[in-house]
Curated annotation (Swiss-Prot):
Protein name: Phosphoenolpyruvate carboxykinase (ATP)
Gene Ontology BP, a term: gluconeogenesis
CDD domains recorded: PEPCK_ATP
Modified residues (N6-acetyllysine): K87, K523
Residues that hold Mn(2+) according to the record: K213, H232, D269
Pfam families to which the protein is assigned, alphabetical: PEPCK_ATP (PF01293)
Catalytic activity: oxaloacetate + ATP = phosphoenolpyruvate + ADP + CO2
UniProt cofactor note: Binds 1 Mn(2+) ion per subunit.
Pathway(s) of this molecule: Carbohydrate biosynthesis; gluconeogenesis
Length: 540
């Protein structure tokens, strides 16, 4: 007997989940809305209705990803290809897991899900049918099903009829691993992957982003091995078909800056770049909402309506939302299907080749200029450096801005060595004749953050070509080409030295930051190509 138009208990038994009598298969948004607001639910399962029509949920103590609890099974599939945390100079979160410990964790999750009423969502990761992953998500929590329905690409009825999953995600958020110490793991919580079984297991953390970023890590493994760029970036396209991609870590402005009324959105966070052009991995957006206002970010604000899902925001008794309240976390979020943004690429989230590549950084030191034009070598250097300030609350335990270097602007999600991503990106850029820029959305010498208004004007100047035609001067030490003036931008802020009481103050901070860049890049100098790029970085 097929249950709910899709799945039999016998199919779940193949994954180790038994005694399931009620499967809610690919639930509609209306059904999820009813399920989330069910008054009989308790704890983190229960949603709250807000005045904007969206349901808000609380993800518990995990208000961001837990990178220290991420593991990958080390076996014949992955041993010689994965970028391991315990090999080489590079620092990453890809900790090896033995097949035996994997079986134990799998047993914990399948035991948790067995005998329960389960939500099963089948969806695609990747807008290109040739390279997409067909993913099956299994959870006992309605809002987690809602999250993946928002964030991944929703199949048509015809596609569902022939759906065969390439990857299984079993979310056992309610279970933990009591044997973690004996197994040499970080804690009782776990986010584990097995490339041979094509499966992800989640235990202990309720944070929805573990499912989203888990599949991103898998695409980051599979695509570059086929010569396809896999990128932690947003992307949009202009009226003339000109495509721009925006790289950057969480909170640097990827979603905000790519959501532009003058351009159609391809996607806000994860993309591939193949022989046909740039394509989205996702079917939704996951926007930060801290200090969100309708005036500053109208597209995102207006996307928060029925079917959107808010996380960790403060909801007052009357259902209104206090977007300024970061007492729970600075990493408050909303997920929504991409069609909640009016100006999107339809019907499929993909476009042609990118001609503008923008690296977004939030410089906590106030040293880097608001914008600079990069040479080919500087493009590779700054891509591999991936400098930003880690912004409050996107990972557990980080509440103040601290400088960080994250290879390819997404080291946490890289499955291969960073140089492999740089090589693929450079090949794609060269073939398309693309130009790269470094844009600082962070702070300057005044201690204030560069305004969204100024940053938007800078992005406009990049996209309409006026920056390429502008006169430039060179910022010492970092050797960056800075425009002398740009339309709509306060000229005084273009040279970061002007925002300090004295040039010596900038010089002092610049030397500190330059040393951090140089020390960080040392890990790439063990190859001739990496050593050759040192000259493109800052010099003391």
């Amino acid at each position: 007997m097929r249950v709910n138009n899709g799945l039999t208990p016998q199919e779940l038994e193949a994954y180790g989940i038994s005694d399931v009598h009620d499967i809610v298969y690919n639930p509609s948004y209306d059904l999820l809305y009813q399920e989330e607001l069910d008054p009989s639910l308790t704890g983190y399962e229960r949603g709250v209705l807000t005045n904007l029509g969206a349901v808000a949920v609380d993800t518990g103590i995990f208000t961001g990803r837990s990178p220290k609890d991420k593991y990958i099974v080390r076996d014949d599939t992955t041993r010689d290809t994965f970028w391991w945390a315990d090999k080489g100079k590079g620092k990453n979160d890809n900790k090896p897991l033995s097949p035996e410990t994997w079986q134990h964790l799998k047993g914990l999750v399948t035991k948790q899900l067995s005998g329960k009423r389960l939500f099963v969502v089948d969806a695609f990761c990747g807008a290109n049918p040739d390279t997409r992953l067909s993913v099956r998500f299994i959870t006992e929590v309605a809002w987690q099903a809602h999250f993946v329905k928002n964030m991944f690409i929703r199949p048509s009825d015809e596609e569902l009829a022939g759906f065969k999953p390439d990857f299984i995600v079993m979310n056992g958020a309610k279970c933990t691993n009591p044997q973690w110490k004996e197994q040499g793991l970080n804690s009782e919580n776990f986010v584990a992957f097995n490339l041979t079984e094509r499966m992800q297991l989640i235990g202990g953390t309720w944070y929805g982003g573990e499912m989203k970023k888990g599949m991103f890590s898998m695409m980051n493994y599979l695509l570059p091995l086929k010569g396809i760029a896999s990128m932690h970036c947003s992307a949009n396209v202009g009226e003339k078909g000109d495509v721009a991609v925006f790289f950057g870590l969480s909170g640097t402005g990827k979603t905000t800056l790519s959501t532009d009324p003058k351009r159609r959105l391809i996607g806000d966070d994860e993309h591939g770049w193949d022989d046909d052009g740039v394509f989205n991995f996702e079917g939704g957006c996951y926007a930060k909402t801290i200090k969100l206002s309708k005036e500053a970010e109208p597209e995102i604000y207006n996307a928060i309506r029925r079917d959107a899902l808010l996380e960790n925001v403060t909801v007052r008794e009357d259902g209104t939302i206090d977007f300024d309240d970061g007492s729970k976390t600075e990493n408050t979020r909303v997920s929504y299907p991409i069609y909640h943004i009016d100006n999107i690429v339809k019907p499929v989230s993909k476009a042609g080749h990118a001609t503008k590549v923008i690296f977004l950084t939030a410089d906590a030191f106030g040293v880097l200029p608001p914008v600079s034009r990069l040479t080919a070598d500087q493009t590779q250097y700054h891509f591999l450096s991936g400098f930003t300030a880690k912004l409050a609350g996107t990972e557990r335990g980080i509440t103040e801005p601290t400088p960080t270097f994250s290879a390819c602007f997404g080291a946490a999600f890289l499955s291969l060595h960073p140089t492999q991503y740089a090589e693929v990106l450079v090949k794609r850029m060269q073939a398309a004749g693309a130009q790269a820029y470094l844009v600082n959305t962070g702070w300057n010498g005044t201690g204030k953050r560069i305004s969204i208004k100024d940053t938007r004007a800078i992005i406009d100047a990049i996209l309409n070509g006026s920056l390429d035609n502008a006169e430039t001067f060179t910022l010492p030490m970092f050797n960056l080409a800075i425009p002398t003036e740009l339309p709509g931008v306060d000229t005084k802020i273009l040279d970061p030295r002007n925002t300090y009481a004295s040039p010596e103050q900038w010089q002092e901070k610049a030397e500190t930051l330059a040393k951090l860049f140089i020390d960080n890049f040392d890990k790439y100098t063990d190859t001739p190509a990496g050593a050759a790029l040192v000259a493109a970085g800052p010099k003391l």
